[in-house]
Swiss-Prot record:
A motif (Switch 2) lies at residues 66-83. This is Ras-related protein Rab-1A. It is found in: Golgi apparatus; Endoplasmic reticulum; Early endosome; Cytoplasm, Cytosol. Changing N124I: Dominant negative mutant. Strongly reduces the levels of CASR present at the cell-surface. Changing R82A: Abolished arginine GlcNAcylation. Abolished arginine GlcNAcylation. It comes from Homo sapiens (Human). InterPro entries: P-loop_NTPase (IPR027417), Rab (IPR050227), Small_GTP-bd (IPR005225), Small_GTPase (IPR001806). SUPFAM superfamilies: P-loop containing nucleoside triphosphate hydrolases. Keywords: Acetylation, Autophagy, Cytoplasm, Endoplasmic reticulum, Endosome, ER-Golgi transport, Glycoprotein, Golgi apparatus, GTP-binding, Hydrolase, Isopeptide bond, Lipoprotein, Magnesium, Membrane, Metal-binding, Nucleotide-binding, Phosphoprotein, Prenylation, Protein transport, Transport, Ubl conjugation.
Length: 205
């Protein structure tokens, strides 16, 4: 299994953040396992998955942490910002409030993450065209003003999901430069079993 293969050139720790219900877990499920479920339930605390990718002839192991969006878990998840190489901020294109809260999530990054961490803005659920309230141009201009890459995704039909994680990996690799090695990121590799605990309530697309 490629995800268990220790032979890799880089290990990047990525973090998914954003309001509860925007589809963070579904994006991760689509990217890591290429599956989707309508009945995915709210993440409690933190879960993570690993996927190994090839980029520019290099093998990159992505350790992707999925955080709970609920306020009561904010203190738990804040510690996961430290050591992250890239942070993906997710909002729901059908939920204006989730987009408005992106600024608050970016403040969390400034507060807890390393100064040079890579960021990516993702507008999820773009398949729900009739319910869309956050315009692509509005989000793109916002991201451009901050110098952050932006993509609209759909975990449901797999639109741009692969591209989002590959974009993030490429940005981190570019920042680290040719001299970086897998060992440089190894200190953030937390050895725990992935045993997500879920509770019912609120699906995602």
């Amino acid at each position: 299994m490629s995800s268990m293969n220790p032979e890799y050139d880089y290990l990047f720790k990525l973090l998914l953040i954003g309001d509860s219900g925007v589809g963070k877990s579904c994006l991760l499920l689509r990217f890591a396992d290429d599956t989707y479920t309508e009945s995915y339930i709210s993440t409690i605390g933190v879960d993570f998955k690993i996927r190994t990718i090839e980029l520019d002839g290099k093998t990159i192991k992505l350790q992707i942490w999925d955080t709970a969006g609920q306020e009561r878990f904010r203190t738990i998840t804040s510690s996961y910002y430290r050591g992250a190489h890239g942070i993906i901020v997710v909002y729901d294109v059908t939920d204006q409030e989730s987009f408005n809260n992106v600024k608050q999530w970016l403040q969390e990054i400034d507060r807890y993450a390393s100064e040079n961490v890579n960021k990516l803005l993702v507008g999820n659920k773009c398949d729900l065209t009739t319910k869309k309230v956050v315009d692509y141009t509005t989000a793109k201009e916002f991201a451009d003003s901050l110098g952050i890459p932006f993509l609209e995704t759909s975990a449901k039909n797999a639109t741009n999901v692969e591209q989002s994680f590959m974009t993030m990996a490429a940005e981190i690799k570019k920042r680290m430069g040719p001299g970086a090695t897998a060992g440089g990121a190894e200190k953030s590799n937390v050895k725990i079993q992935s045993t997500p605990v879920k509770q019912s309530g609120g699906g995602c697309c």
